[in-house]
Amino acid sequence: MTKYFAIGDVHGKAGMLDELLQHWDGHSQLVFLGDLIDRGEDSRAVLERVKALVEQEGAVCLSGNHEYMFLTWLDNPEKSYDHYRRNGGDTTINSLLGRPLNAPVYGVADAEGVKTETADLVDFI
């Protein structure tokens, strides 16, 4: 019988992810249940860590509503930015672009920057 270790709703908190992973035995199937991004201080580090675990350890990663909002914003930044911003998107955008979390965000221009500068992470999501 397969054992599973599931993690969800990390919301950009890399430290919390590291703490949770300390409880994983390394043998159980690791499953991420989505909502890896938004609100927290380091969505980029969370995505990089989870992507590495998927590629190197065979972890499974499901998308949550926050990943969906992120991708919707990238597809149509003019229409979707306000909704995404209200759900913690600015912290993810700034984290991905390597800026201070309180830096101003420019919905359309930053969508292009995220697509260009973090294409591997966007593809992963």
What is the meaning of each model-derived region?
Residues 1-49, 59:
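N-terminal active-site segment of His-dependent metallophosphoesterases
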